[in-house]
């Protein structure tokens, strides 16, 4: 997979995801267990998949520099040679914080097998190449382990 990723290229096309990709029938979960109320999210309630995601969402909600965010649906993906890659979050920052008003964040926890992690890392490398070619310089993509790491990335790159 590493050799394929080294040579993969993405090119901008004139197609976009329709806003219906964010149409959601209902959040299915248990409030306080795997779902939480949200004010800055696209929806009133958000389901999280891990403790790391829950902590990340809480920090997004608390921080004044966050304009809005969305946990990206499974219907939003980037095609890669290793299969579909589903980024976790789309985040909109207030303009004064970063030169990148938009940020796509990957917050995967490392509790999967070595083989799964290698495949996921290859998909993440493809996503980096995808977003570098298709965003017009206004969007930053990165894997982050915490909200604090996200802030460090956007504030260092705005200097």
Segments (PLM) and residue ranges:
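Intrinsically disordered, low-complexity, repeat-rich regions
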Residues: 1-85, 92-159
């Amino acid at each position: 997979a590493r050799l394929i990723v080294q040579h993969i290229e993405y090119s901008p096309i004139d197609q976009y995801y329709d806003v219906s990709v964010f149409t959601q029938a209902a959040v299915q979960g248990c409030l306080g267990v795997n779902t939480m109320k949200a004010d800055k999210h696209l929806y009133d309630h958000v389901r999280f998949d891990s403790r790391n995601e829950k902590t990340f969402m809480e920090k997004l909600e608390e921080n004044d520099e966050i304009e809005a965010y969305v946990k990206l649906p499974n219907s939003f993906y980037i095609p890669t040679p290793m299969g579909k890659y589903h980024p976790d979050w789309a985040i909109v920052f207030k303009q004064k914080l970063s030169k990148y008003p938009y940020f796509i964040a990957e917050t995967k926890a490392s509790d999967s097998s070595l083989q799964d992690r290698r495949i996921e890392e290859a998909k993440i490398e493809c996503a980096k190449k995808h977003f570098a070619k298709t965003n017009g310089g206004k969007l930053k993509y990165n894997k982050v382990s915490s909200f604090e790491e996200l802030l460090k990335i956007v504030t260092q790159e705005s200097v």
